[in-house]
Structures are given as C-alpha cells and as structure tokens.
C-alpha cells in the first residue's frame, strides 16, 4: 500500500500525477523589480528549490553563480510528496519521490549534471573542518571588485 500526504493520483497506466497546485497559473512579474547585481552562492548541498532557483538564474543570466556545482540537477529533480512503501519480504521502508520536476531552462543538450557556477570555487576538507567559508569569501571578493569598477 502506498502512503502519501499530498494530492497525488495514479492514472490507468500506473503513472502518478499532481492533482492540484495553486501556482500553476500565469505568474505576472512585479512592476518594480530589483535592478542591482545578484550573486547566488552554491555548494554540493544545494538541492531541490535552491538548485531550481540556481538553474533559472543561470539560464536567464539574471545573476552570477559562485561556488561549487549544485547537488541538484540543472534540468530539474525528482522530489515532492514522498511515497512510502514497505517491502513485503524484508519489511524495509522505502521512500520514493514520485514527482519529476522539469525546469524551463535553456537546453544544454545531453547535460546530466548540476548547475556549474560561473565562478567555480575549490573547497577542501580542511576548509570544511575549520569552517573556512571559501565560497562566501570568493563571493565577497567579487562583490568588492565589482563595486570598485562601479565607482572608478
């Protein structure tokens, strides 16, 4: 038996579908958008909505992405209301993400990776252990340099 807490249905072919969602209608942009520079910091734990946001920023060239390749895919992901199944022989509980999200992004061909930052920052285990946030430091350096160019 499948257990879910979301409005997910199954059609006659065995495919699951999302029944309703309040934001499936046309989204109208605000009349006063932010016009400054946008910097998005990413790392290997950038999944789900944050990876989707990074994909849109990169595809639409709306900001500079700084950091490490995202853990989530460029084209989308499988997530949403998790379906729980208890395997009959072992009794092991498994959770399956039934919803496949496709992002409205520029096609990069046969691309199977996460979002690659515009400025790639190399992290190492020492930085992580010492809590040395090299991604933040790189982003702040870029922002500082960009501001110097503006005020020269």
Regions found by a protein language model. Name each.
Residues 1-152:
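C-terminal "post-core" interaction segments
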């Amino acid at each position: 038996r499948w257990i879910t807490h979301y409005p997910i249905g199954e059609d006659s072919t065995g495919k699951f579908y999302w029944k309703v969602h309040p934001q499936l209608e046309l989204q109208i942009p605000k009349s006063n958008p932010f016009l400054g520079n946008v910097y998005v910091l990413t790392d290997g734990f950038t999944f789900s909505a944050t990876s989707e946001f990074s994909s849109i920023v990169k595809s639409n060239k709306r900001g500079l992405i700084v950091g490490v390749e995202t853990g989530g895919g460029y084209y989308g992901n499988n997530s949403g209301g998790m379906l729980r199944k208890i395997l009959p022989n072992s009794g092991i509980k498994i959770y399956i993400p039934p919803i496949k999200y496709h992002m409205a992004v520029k096609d990069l061909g046969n691309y199977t990776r996460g979002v690659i930052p515009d400025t790639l920052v190399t992290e190492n285990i020492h930085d992580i252990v010492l809590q040395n946030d090299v991604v933040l430091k790189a982003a702040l350096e870029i922002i500082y340099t960009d501001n110097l160019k503006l005020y020269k």
